[in-house]
C-alpha cells in the first residue's frame, strides 16, 4: 500500500516526525499520498473523521487534521480515497496488456465501477477494496493465474491512462493536483 505509517514504524507520530523533518530541511512544498484504508488509529482526527458518513467529507477531515498536525503552510496533505488502486479503475483495459486471458474478470470490474459515480467511490470495505477486487480478477479465485504485481501494474496503468483521465474521473485526486499546480504557480516548489 501507500501508507507511510507502515513504512515509518506503524504509527502516525513517526510519519509526522519525518514530515516535519523534511519540511524544516527544504524550502519546497511537501505532499503525501496515503491510502485512506489502514490509516493508524493514532492519526490526527481519527475518531472524528470516522464518524463522518460522506466519504469525501471524511477524507477531507483527515487531511485537515494532518495539515494542522504538521503545522506548515508548505504542506499539502493528500489521502487517497480509498486506496491507490482506485486510480487503476480509470484504465482497467490496460491491465489486459499485462495479464492476458483476464477479459471476463476485467469486465466484472467494469460492472462494479458502473455501479458508482467514479473510481474513488468503488468501495468502502477493506475486504472488497479496489486492490482486493483487482487481485481477485487477475489471480483468480484459486490464485491459479498470474501473481498480481501492484506497484508495477499501478504505475503501468497510470502512465497509460494519463493525468487528464485520472483527474477527470477522480475528483478528490484532481483537487490535490490543482493544489499542487497552484503551489507551482506561486513559485513554492
What residues fall within each predicted segment?
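A short beta-strand-loop structural module common to alpha/beta enzyme folds
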Residues: 1-9
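Ligand-binding grooves and catalytic loops that recognize ribose/phosphate and carbohydrate rings
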Residues: 8-17
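C-terminal accessory helical subdomains adjacent to catalytic cores in phosphodiester-
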Residues: 16-189
